[in-house]
Amino acid sequence: MALEMYDVIIHRHNVLYLDDSGILHLIDTASGKDMVYCDKPNCTHEGFSGSNEKPSCPAAFYGLEGAGTVLYNDHLYYVGNMSDEDMTVQYLYVMDSNGENRKKAAKLENIQNVTAVLYRDNYVIGAYSNRIELNDEEQIVNDDKPEAGIFVIDLDNYKVYMSDKITSEQANITDIYYEDEVVYYSTVRFGDDVTELMIEEGASDDAESFAYDNMLNGIYQYDIADEKTTCLTEIDHINDLRLLDGDGYYSSKDGYFVFDTESRQTRQLPIDADGKTQYGPLKKSGDFLYYALSEEKSDEVTYYRLKDDKSEELMKLSTEKAFSIASICGQSVYVTYTNDNGKLCLGVISLDELNKGVFEPKELRCFDDEE
């Protein structure tokens, strides 16, 4: 699985990212070593530019990063557009594991922004969003036509499958999950009666309350074999819907809940958040649900794990030392936190350390303020 965060793609044993010049780097999780993803002798690692339109470095990438560059089954894959041919077309690029012999393997039409990617079995599964409508001459005829959906590419024959689109203001895909030839994905959008002007006015008054009152959060499934899209549920007045192992976890003013995508039933979770605020996203590993709550009066963040409706406290940290879990990949827990120099950083701890309440992260990368 790949997880996009800032310009970073997180894997089980490494992290890939593109630097400001579009050069691919790999960070080895075990050692923390950051290296340019290139094994060509004497390469200067020059990226794309006006004076270097065809760089020889296999680590050079161009265009919107989209969902980043992913190592999978001994190949390097990239979903994006490095040709500037058409802003509504993206490609799946396939290359050798060292970045050489790059070729376009599949064409994705009517897709402007790739927002996430997942590699499972023999599929590339991605989420996208569009904002503008173009005519045949590629002129903008409507700059406010938001829509979003998912695509699936079969790596055996590079056939492209497309789900039905969701529309309306700020339509977006927030999570994707794959299991047994079915893709589950969560969506967010404003109701059909909410206009862009209403959103602007609501944001200027109280953006968080306006979103809570007017956002619709959905869970869909896409059956690849039948090429069928089904809306399983759409919920209003909730916060931060997350797909964890295919089920939808979220909170509202009434507490924490999980929507079971198989039974299509919702049940409340025994999480006591009275007088507390969720800190960071919910995450799962096996049967455990990990969550953190900040306490308004104590300036502390408490970390828990939940199993069989029983919560276990793992640790307490001051808000200055607190962290958010970005991803749990096997025994590696990737976290974001602020280091002693005030920089936002990506680091890693082991799952065993998390369960024992030990937070001594290995720093992998720090982000500039503009990132």
Predicted regions and their residues:
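Short loop/turn segments that connect beta-strands within beta-propeller blades
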Residues: 28-32, 96-100, 154-158, 223-227, ...
